[in-house]
Curated annotation (Swiss-Prot):
Residue numbers annotated as active site: C396
Keyword Mitochondrion attributed: no
EC number(s) on file: 2.1.1.190
HAMAP family: 23SrRNA_methyltr_RlmD
Class of enzymatic activity (EC top level): transferase
Organism for this UniProt entry: Aliivibrio fischeri (strain MJ11) (Vibrio fischeri)
Stored Gene3D superfamilies: 2.40.50.1070, Nucleic acid-binding proteins, Vaccinia Virus protein VP39
Protein encoded by which gene: rlmD
GO biological process: rRNA base methylation
Protein known as: 23S rRNA (uracil(1939)-C(5))-methyltransferase RlmD
Amino acid sequence: MAQFFKPKKKASVNTKHLSVDVVRLDHNGAGIAFVDKKPVFIEGALPGEKAIIQFIEQKKQFSRAKLIKLAQKSEKRQTPICQHYHECGGCNLQHLQHEEQIVAKNEKLQELMKKQGVSQGEMVQPIMGEELSYRRRARISLMINKQTNQLDFGFRKKQSKAIVNVRHCPVLVQELDQHLESLFTLLNQLKGKKNLGHVELVQADNGSVLLIRHVADFNEKDHQALVNYCEERNLILYLMPEADVLNHVRGEEPFYLIDGTKIYFTPKDFIQVNRKVNEQMVEQALSWLDLNENDSVLDLFCGLGNFSLPLAKKVKTVVGIEGVDDMVQRAKLNAERNHLSNVSFYQANLEEEASDQVWASTKFTKILLDPARAGAAGVMETVAKLKPQTVVYVSCNPATLARDSQLLIQHGFKLTRLGMLDMFPHTGHLESMALFER
């Protein structure tokens, strides 16, 4: 007998306005209220506020709602610094005083560790940099506006592919922010502007970098206009005609300094966006490892050598492991350029068990790891089996840090220090550092 497909009825959403009391923030910075014992997530609401909301999504376990207005405001609320704040998808906590953002993130970090049954040890003071003008990297979205035939130039709207036109961003370092207006004007004048994909701006220690992604070659006039613009402003220029092709057109090779070491990079490479916090982060990690000249250190998820190269100046040997081979090759070159012969780099998939790797049979006294948001579940068994004296875990996701901490504790480690890094002020992103000792 034939069976006919019957599409499920789309769940209806109660669109009536409702008054709720906001009790806390979630790990992304949204306010949480409870309706019939079910959590409701409200972007833009703060603890202690009475909010008038409208549901936009209702599920079995939770709901999401739009903030209509505030019947009662928190004393910790402030006027957002940016004129685009309520549209732009970048920052989401500018309505909360910065010092209160720190408090909320600290509480969230401790809450997640406690939830996983991890005893936190000493809670150290947060690492902080500038509240504004801290981002040394930005990706500018571009799109032809069909109504005006001009480029939309800026950042994506909240939960949308549409673009908020931006000519000034208060969290960008001033060296980059100053170019937004003139860059918009230049790109709009190009004959081939419809072939533009996106733009990236990166602030290196030896200049500002402009990367232009394009899907067709520029004509000679457009190409020269780009070169002239960069020469007038002393910008380092890269053109990217394909996803895996990067052409260095003018300027020096970009680098940044960390602990007196030059880290060369391309605008495709990952680097930490907050220079001041990165410098303090590396300094604290090296301090927590309590290094001596006889130590052998393993640096997992090492990237270009942000930790590995400063480590190599203080210990006997360093081994850096990274999943992206291009970055491994550049890390090796960075070691050579800094005349560091006691550090070696290997490519490995750290999402998988690594005990059969050559480097995993080495005796390491200390281990540092700095994984992406997914954490380091694949390599934690290897870390535990290596039995180092000390492990420093740098995390950009407290949930995966809490999860991975459990395995170390099961293998006899104790979490002795925990601290927050204010890498991304005015956002819900929470970075942290944990020290484990046996």
